[in-house]
């Protein structure tokens, strides 16, 4: 039996699934790669009228082509079927019918896929901006044997201005990697697949032979499909044992329409994580691009969201098409006032934001989840079980959490370090929302987010504003150091505390000292009275106790 690692080392020609890349077989439905061979279709002769019309349209196409008027991509008279390519049953069920089991999409570790990487490879680490930096793997960017690049996807989920991507965004994140993470990357490119933003910049950044590497659902295969549509001569290929390109696939060259040709070569894209099962190779112009399966940084700690959230709601969270860019433009918010009883704002009954007493907050939710206020977290969680047991409950639309996460014991209490102005709260593989206190500044306590155990959470300064303001400062000073602030941490983990902890501020100091015990140089502001720091509005923000473990 071949190990997964050995499977990724194979560079032999075989009939593979167009969508996931797995080797196909038609003998055993219970074995990986099963597909149903297409049936031979007998064409009816048709009526005389049908034949006359067919001859007329074919003659019309031929005449237009002869005089240079026929454009296969735009002419309505051009009729061209796309040749069929074989797809395994798993992918057909998932893509066409949204019918799947999570067990059919196993998790890959980095060790599972690293066998496909040659020594001294051109590695393009694809990272989602939606949950940045939780899908960024420092070990990939720190590998000195490789030439490392950073491709930041889903840029349309942090800004509605594509003009920010090529210069401001790239400069900011290049300096961010160097100064905050301690790694040097050869190039940074921000892009958006759904809106086709900055795709030419990605092509220009690609080396002659490169490898796309990243977590599941960060947009690697979607990027491949964008590249195929951008460059009409591109196609899906295979590699022989020596690494030479074999291709294009049968049927490619007979397609005249560039758009249809790109569709013919597209890889399978789905909101389901771990969809790609083996390395898939593409020739983009004269560049060999290898799309590797998404991998999980620490499979022992991964939490399958399918075990937490109802299927329909989870599908909506994962589908990039559900993100509404209007929210970035209009900034429509929910007003939330803190109370002594711990009033909370619940997001789909999945996680709950608790602001300090007497604070007035604007919450902008960029996650496709309904919001609802409850008197406290205990009330919200206890109601979730009641709601799930009654299909006709009046609050049914506000709850999507599965058992056993309908018990407060299954939740972690994430305490958020102090902040000035707005922050973005980020949840791994889910997205982010923004919290902005309003009115006269005053420190009334710490914010909390109650989340089912196992879901990673962090906070960050609002990315779009941070990038724009920093670039403006850089233009004024001419000092590249100003393109990304280094006077404070810009990202932080949260502090998970006991449900009964009362003095969260003092406990946070203890936890901060413990977290930084092996990173003394990252410690800040410990010589000052913390109450003095949070007692006054700081500009720029002090970000007391902010610390992120890369």
From Swiss-Prot:
<dbReference type="GO" id="GO:0005525">
    <property type="term" value="F:GTP binding"/>
</dbReference>
<protein>
    <recommendedName>
        <fullName>Genetic interactor of prohibitins 3, mitochondrial</fullName>
    </recommendedName>
</protein>
<feature type="domain" description="CP-type G">
    <location>
        <begin position="107"/>
        <end position="298"/>
    </location>
</feature>
<dbReference type="GO" id="GO:0005739">
    <property type="term" value="C:mitochondrion"/>
</dbReference>
<comment type="similarity">
    <text>Belongs to the TRAFAC class YlqF/YawG GTPase family. GEP3 subfamily.</text>
</comment>
<dbReference type="InterPro" id="IPR050896">
    <property type="entry name" value="Mito_lipid_metab_GTPase"/>
</dbReference>
<feature type="transit peptide" description="Mitochondrion">
    <location>
        <begin position="1"/>
        <end position="43"/>
    </location>
</feature>
<keyword id="KW-0809">Transit peptide</keyword>
<dbReference type="InterPro" id="IPR030378">
    <property type="entry name" value="G_CP_dom"/>
</dbReference>
<keyword id="KW-0496">Mitochondrion</keyword>
<dbReference type="InterPro" id="IPR027417">
    <property type="entry name" value="P-loop_NTPase"/>
</dbReference>
<comment type="function">
    <text>May be involved in the mitochondrial lipid metabolism.</text>
</comment>
């Amino acid at each position: 039996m071949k190990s997964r690692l050995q499977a990724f080392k194979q560079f032999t020609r075989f009939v593979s699934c167009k969508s996931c890349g797995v080797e196909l077989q038609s003998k055993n439905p219970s074995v990986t790669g099963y597909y149903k061979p297409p049936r031979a279709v007998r064409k009816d002769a048709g009526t005389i009228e049908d034949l006359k019309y067919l001859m007329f349209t074919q003659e019309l196409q031929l005449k237009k082509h002869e005089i240079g008027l026929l454009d296969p991509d735009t002419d309505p008279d051009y009729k061209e079927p796309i040749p069929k390519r074989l797809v395994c049953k798993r992918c057909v069920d998932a893509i066409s019918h949204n019918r799947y089991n999570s067990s059919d999409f196993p998790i890959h570790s980095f060790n599972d896929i690293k066998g496909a990487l040659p020594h001294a490879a051109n590695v393009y680490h694809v990272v989602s901006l939606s949950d940045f930096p939780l899908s960024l793997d420092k070990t990939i960017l720190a590998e000195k044997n490789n030439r490392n690049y950073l491709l930041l996807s889903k840029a349309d989920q942090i800004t509605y201005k594509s003009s920010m991507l090529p210069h401001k965004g790239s400069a900011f994140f290049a300096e961010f990697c160097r100064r905050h993470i301690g790694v040097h990357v050869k190039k940074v490119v921000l892009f958006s697949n759904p809106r086709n933003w900055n795709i030419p910049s990605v092509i220009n950044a690609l080396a002659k032979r490169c490898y796309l590497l990243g977590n599941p659902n960060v947009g690697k295969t979607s990027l491949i499909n964008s590249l195929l549509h951008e460059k009409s001569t591109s196609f899906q290929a295979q590699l022989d044992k020596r690494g030479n390109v074999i291709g294009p696939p049968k049927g490619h060259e007979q397609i005249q329409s560039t758009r249809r040709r790109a569709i013919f070569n597209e890889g399978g894209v789905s909101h389901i994580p771990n969809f790609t099962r083996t390395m898939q190779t593409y020739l983009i112009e004269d560049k060999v691009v290898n799309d590797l399966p998404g991998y999980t940084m620490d499979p022992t700690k991964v939490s399958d969201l399918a075990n937490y959230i109802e299927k329909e709601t989870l599908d909506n969270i994962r589908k990039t098409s559900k993100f509404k860019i209007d929210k970035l433009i209009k900034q429509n918010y929910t007003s939330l006032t803190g109370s002594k009883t711990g009033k909370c704002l619940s997001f789909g009954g999945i996680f709950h934001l608790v602001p300090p007493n007497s604070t007035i907050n604007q919450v902008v939710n960029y996650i496709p989840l309904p919001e609802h206020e409850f008197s406290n977290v205990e009330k919200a969680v206890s109601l979730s079980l009641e709601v799930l047991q009654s299909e006709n409950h009046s609050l049914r639309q506000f709850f999507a959490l599965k058992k056993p996460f309908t018990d407060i014991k299954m939740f972690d209490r994430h305490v958020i370090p102090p902040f000035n102005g707005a922050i973005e709260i980020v949840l791994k593989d889910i997205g982010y929302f923004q919290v902005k206190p309003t009115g006269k500044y005053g420190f009334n306590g710490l914010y909390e987010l109650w989340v089912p155990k196992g879901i990673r959470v962090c906070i960050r300064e609002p990315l779009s504003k941070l990038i724009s303001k920093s670039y403006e400062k850089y233009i004024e000073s001419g000092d590249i150091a100003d393109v990304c602030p280094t006077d404070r941490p810009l990202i932080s983990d949260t502090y998970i505390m006991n449900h009964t902890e009362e003095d969260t501020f003092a406990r946070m100091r203890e936890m901060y000292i413990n977290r930084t015990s092996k990173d003394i140089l990252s410690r800040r502001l410990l010589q000052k009275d913390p109450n003095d720091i949070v007692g006054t509005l700081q500009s720029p923000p002090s970000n007391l106790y902010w610390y992120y473990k890369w």
